[in-house]
Amino acid sequence: MSTHPIHVFSEIGKLKKVMLHRPGKELENLMPDYLERLLFDDIPFLEDAQKEHDNFAQALRNEGIEVLYLEKLAAESLTSPEIRDQFIEEYLDEANIRGRQTKVAIRELLQGIKDNQELVEKTMAGVQKAELPEIPEAAKGLTDLVESDYPFAIDPMPNLYFTRDPFATIGNAVSLNHMYADTRNRETLYGKYIFKYHPVYGGNVELVYNREEDTRIEGGDELVLSKDVLAVGISQRTDAASIEKLLVNIFKKNVGFKKVLAFEFANNRKFMHLDTVFTMVDYDKFTIHPEIQGNLRVFSVTYENEQLKIVEEKGDLAELLAENLGVEKVTLIPCGDGNAVAAAREQWNDGSNTLTIAPGVVVVYDRNTVTNKKLEEYGLRLIKIRGSELVRGRGGPRCMSMPFEREEI
């Protein structure tokens, strides 16, 4: 086994270590009037969401997988009072706080929290204006005087339980992402501190993308197909310019990959990431949402003479994948068994967003019965979890997990 703290050279190698985030009070700060602002369509019931998430984590442990938690790793990264204060200041600077005195009050609130994990969880939950002391009239600035009725001094981060997106593990390296929306881009701060200051992961992991970049990329669009081949999605959340930056860094830093397949597909919320429509479940099998296949474009990207070489592939997708993975044949298993109604319904409920924990062993939501039956017909072993509340955030088992270590295949 590798001595590197991050070791992910496939989507299907036996999963040894994975990072999750247990949903917290950030979900209780969702409001109907501001769902779109926070990239939600509905409000999960926190108590049941936590039960479902705990069952997900236990299902992974039952398979011998070590489960890490984002909130604990971030807390462990605040290794000195100076780093703790720096974290608070950086968090405040990125929180879009309106009002000078409001920022002072929030700083005092956060500095008064002595336990590091409690501090981290508070930054995730957001800050309601009602939690802060009333600002004296004489101390109010213009912003304080004209501020709207918006109830939050700092927005919550309700998408955090989708740990796949703020950063992505690629080989022994990490892509610390710049995300599509401001409300999610703040999530990458935790990854920054983990990979800079954590006793195990800090300073020991190569970054192949950095959150300070000005173009957007998210982990749901970054798939590690093999030790030689990556797949990336050009999607609603990830643009082509970011992919080019990422790939140049991967090739220049000799992270270990020889080719990238870039998938361009529909730019909309229901297909927000590549992994919502396409995931690898075995050496020679993938799930796919049939609706994307007609308009899908695939580009092969290599690195020659210090520059990217890009070729659009015109052939059959299954044949292209088989050729690049070195297998005789690839089977594309359609979400919803190809039925238009079932496919649309089950893709919306993340029927294509599977987490493979070993070749042919896949974690899925139990609700996607048509797709699950098809996967079982192809010989896959399914670990079914309930997700009636978790799915309201529009993400499945792959979205909710970030592998830190897999066995090689």
Swiss-Prot record:
InterPro entries noted in UniProt: Arg_deiminase
A Pfam family per the record: ADI
Keywords, in A-Z order: Arginine metabolism, Cytoplasm, Hydrolase
Similarity annotation: Belongs to the arginine deiminase family.
UniProt induction comment: Expression of arcA is significantly higher in cells that have entered stationary phase than in exponential-phase cells. Up-regulated by low pH and by arginine. Repressed by the CcpA protein. Part of the arc operon, that consists of the arcABCDT genes.
GO molecular function term, any single one: arginine deiminase activity
Primary location: cytoplasm
GO biological process, one term: arginine deiminase pathway
Gene assigned in the entry: arcA
GO annotations of cellular component type: cytoplasm
The EC number(s) this enzyme carries: 3.5.3.6
Protein name: Arginine deiminase
Keyword Lipoprotein: no
SUPFAM superfamilies per the UniProt record, alphabetical: Pentein
Catalytic activity: L-arginine + H2O = L-citrulline + NH4(+)
Active-site residues, Swiss-Prot/TrEMBL: C399 (amidino-cysteine intermediate)
Protein origin, superkingdom: Bacteria
Pathway involvement of the protein, from the record: Amino-acid degradation; L-arginine degradation via ADI pathway; carbamoyl phosphate from L-arginine: step 1/2
Subcellular locations according to the entry: Cytoplasm
